[in-house]
Amino acid sequence: AMGFWQCKLRYQTQDEVLTIARRYKELNIPLSVIVIDFFHWTQQGDWRFDPEYFPDPKAMIDELHEMGVRVMISIWPTVDRTSVNYEEMSERDLLIRTDRGLNVTMECWGMQCFIDPTNPETREFVWQKAMENYRSHGVDLFWLDEAEPEYTVQDFDIYRYYDGPANECANEYPARYSQTFFDGMKKEGIENPLNLVRCAWAGSQRYGALVWSGDVPSTFTYLRYQLTAGLNMGLAGIAWWTADIGGFHGGNVHDPAFQELLMRWFQFGAFCPVMRLHGDRDPHY
């Protein structure tokens, strides 16, 4: 329904993104969306392209649009303590807090805090940064990763949200995360916003949530599991669902068994609401 989406972990430079899209065009293979994954940014929580690797994102996106390709960008809800936005967000209570110990909720190449999208001011702040640094360059869609959120320390009793203690309200996190971008895009006049998100909760469908099944292994067993996952997502009221074609990790592109799996997963993907290729393939050169 939404065409074919090209994605991988990850495109490291502007030139790499354009090289892939141009090759699709040369081969006359239809491409609807290309996805730029994580760590394209200067720092977690800056929500902007790293100019060293993406020196002219607007020119890149303009060329992609000329080819008929829309652009999706990965967003993480994490703010590193060295981010340009950390101090302001911390002072304004726009981040999830801990009621004891160090105020760090994730450690991923640094120490980070998660944004608190249950706070309306947080939703407005994050959307404004996305407007300034992504939408202004022409980015069409957002990939809302880490949406659970993925706490490094799972002592849930210590986390405090705007809406209350985590043990009482944490499940609403992915819905409010989706709402952040849905509301912003609606204000722009986009009639039916749709964004990819790694987690959902009751009511997420009202915020344009396209959920995918996460980082699943590249095996036939997990291909079979996708049938169950997709059906259950639909029964939960969320119609927009997809999976990583080929699975996310463990697939070697030179392995005939993986090549067979990839072909079969493509066949399955053609009947999903969104046909999206993604993964972290071996070998890593």
Model-derived regions, located:
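Catalytic-domain carbohydrate-binding cleft regions of carbohydrate-active enzymes
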Residues: 1-285
